[in-house]
């Protein structure tokens, strides 16, 4: 079955035909490294990690290149260094490692060039300044960029298709602009390729304009990805991915400057939708903002974070809720029990592969997994079930036995399930005292117990206390 992917550029689902099946190439915009990755930052990493795994499964690990950058030169980084009194190098090195650790915790493979070179597949912007300067000089020579007051700007009117990716016209963009336009811009929508740096700001020798350097400065955000993608993947590559919030202006600007530099750039553009928390936009002002590390430190396993993310299709808004987290922990606990002692057969279920090949339909894949779980009886069933989980990036820490948080979370669910079972048994024997005592104990530990004619169900409330639960053993 052919992989089908929704292409933002054409606004339709298309058969994916790589330029070269022996060298499938994908670029995904990475983080600006000045702080911890919040939960929304994890969504594109997880989404495109699933695509990376699918491409590796389809074409072979040695035939897929996946590049994801780090932006380590940015005004936010400069501001963080100034307010903290620490060096930029120290901050970017620390936050880069934080990101790598947190994304590994949610099961993301490191990007790699044909399964051989991880470091080059995770380029830092500061390593590619020379390539950026060369591209800027080329754009100036071709009449697509101009120098003004120490800046170099891209002239959007020189590119007739500007706005095609996001479906915007230049006139509408100008009319809707609410920020003051710099007086040195020829057009309000022209964007910065290079900007001057003072003595307190990182800087490099700038592009040569009219036979001399424009002066010390630093690159604009958009030129970074174009230069790194071109250097590592070539003038034309297969897939470019990122969050929906990057479609404009970042990806729109990438396309404009790359095309005008003579590069066809990416054939397929993919965007994941944004994340909400309990139905609301995640923000510090609403008190619902948290990082991936916050969840991990609270004992939420990375496998659970990943599972919740994959339960919603990547092109739909993802709503993170406590209920979904609890349901994910219960499901993964049962699946872990099934696969204890299993060995990967390297034969994932074909139905799951078909779901993933249909524009990464992970919700359908998970619904099929629920059915396969119920049907699994033989060792071969369990081995194939584990193989399928591994294709989705789930179950690797179970097999390696290294994730303490996962084990603790599953032990918690196991204890609650055992206590619920004792309530059901006591009620069947009309031992109301034992039933009430156990239920009261669970309630005091923050576990809400509901008893109905259909049986006993439970969910963890906001006051859940693991220590009180442990005391009920």
Curated annotation (Swiss-Prot):
Location in or out of the cell: Cytoplasm
The entry's keywords: Aminoacyl-tRNA synthetase, ATP-binding, Cytoplasm, Ligase, Metal-binding, Nucleotide-binding, Protein biosynthesis, Zinc
Catalytic reaction annotation: tRNA(Cys) + L-cysteine + ATP = L-cysteinyl-tRNA(Cys) + AMP + diphosphate
Cofactor comment text: Binds 1 zinc ion per subunit.
UniProt-listed Pfam families: tRNA-synt_1e (PF01406)
Alphabetical list of CDD domains matching this protein: CysRS_core
Gene Ontology MF: a single term: cysteine-tRNA ligase activity
Binding residues annotated for ATP, in chain numbering: 284
Residues the entry annotates as binding Zn(2+): 29, 225, 250, 254
Required cofactor names: Zn(2+)
GO cellular component, one term: cytosol
Renumbered ranges of motif 'HIGH' region: 31-41
Motif 'KMSKS' region, residue numbers: 281-285
Protein's GO biological process: cysteinyl-tRNA aminoacylation
EC number: 6.1.1.16
Principal cellular location given in the protein's record: cytoplasm
Family that this chain belongs to: Belongs to the class-I aminoacyl-tRNA synthetase family.
Assembly and binders: Monomer.
Name of the featured protein: Cysteine--tRNA ligase
């Amino acid at each position: 079955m052919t992989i089908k992917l929704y292409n933002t550029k054409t606004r339709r689902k298309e058969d994916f035909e790589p330029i070269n099946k022996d060298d499938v190439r994908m670029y995904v915009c990475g983080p600006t490294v000045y702080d911890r990755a919040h939960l929304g930052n994890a969504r594109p990493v997880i989404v495109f990690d699933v695509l990376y795994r699918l491409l590796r499964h389809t074409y072979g690990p040695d035939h897929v290149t996946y590049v994801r950058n780090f932006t380590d030169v940015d005004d936010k980084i400069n501001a963080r260094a100034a307010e903290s009194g620490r060096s930029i190098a120290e901050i970017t090195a620390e936050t880069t490692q934080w990101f790598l650790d947190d994304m590994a915790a949610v099961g993301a493979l490191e990007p790699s060039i044909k399964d051989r070179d991880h470091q080059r597949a995770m380029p830092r912007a500061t390593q590619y300044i020379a390539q950026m300067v060369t591209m800027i000089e080329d754009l100036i020579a071709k009449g697509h960029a101009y120098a003004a007051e120490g800046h170099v700007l891209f002239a959007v009117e020189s590119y007739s298709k500007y706005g095609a990716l996001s479906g915007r016209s230049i006139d509408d963009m100008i009319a809707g602009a609410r920020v003051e336009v710099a007086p040195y811009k020829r057009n309000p929508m022209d964007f910065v390729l290079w900007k001057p740096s003072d003595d307190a700001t990182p800087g490099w020798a700038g592009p040569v304009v009219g036979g001399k350097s424009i002066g010390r400065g630093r690159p604009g955000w958009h030129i970074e990805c174009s230069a790194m993608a071109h250097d590592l993947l070539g003038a034309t590559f297969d897939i470019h991915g990122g969050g929906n919030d990057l479609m404009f202006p970042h990806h729109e600007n990438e396309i404009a400057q790359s095309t005008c530099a003579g590069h066809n750039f990416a054939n397929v553009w993919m965007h994941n939708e944004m994340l909400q928390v309990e139905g609301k936009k995640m923000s510090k002002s609403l008190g619902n903002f948290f990082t991936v590390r916050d969840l991990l430190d609270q004992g939420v396993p990375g496998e659970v974070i990943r599972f919740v993310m994959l339960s919603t299709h990547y092109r739909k808004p993802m709503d993170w809720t406590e209920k979904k987290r609890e349901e994910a922990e219960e499901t993964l606990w049962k699946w872990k029990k099934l696969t204890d002692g299993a060995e990967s057969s390297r034969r994932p279920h074909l139905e799951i592969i078909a779901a993933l090949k249909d524009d990464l339909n992970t919700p359908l894949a998970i619904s099929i997994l629920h059915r396969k779980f119920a049907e699994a009886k033989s060792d071969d069933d369990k081995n194939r079930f584990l193989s399928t989980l591994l294709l989705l990036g789930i179950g690797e820490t179970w097999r390696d036995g290294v994730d303490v948080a996962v084990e603790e979370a599953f032990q918690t669910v196991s204890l609650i399930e055992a206590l619920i079972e004792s309530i059901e048994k006591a009620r069947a024997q009309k031992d109301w005292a034992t039933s009430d005592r156990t239920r009261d104990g669970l309630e005091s530990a923050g576990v809400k117990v509901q008893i109905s004619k259909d049986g006993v169900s439970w969910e963890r409330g906001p006051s859940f206390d693991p220590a009180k639960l442990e005391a009920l053993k």
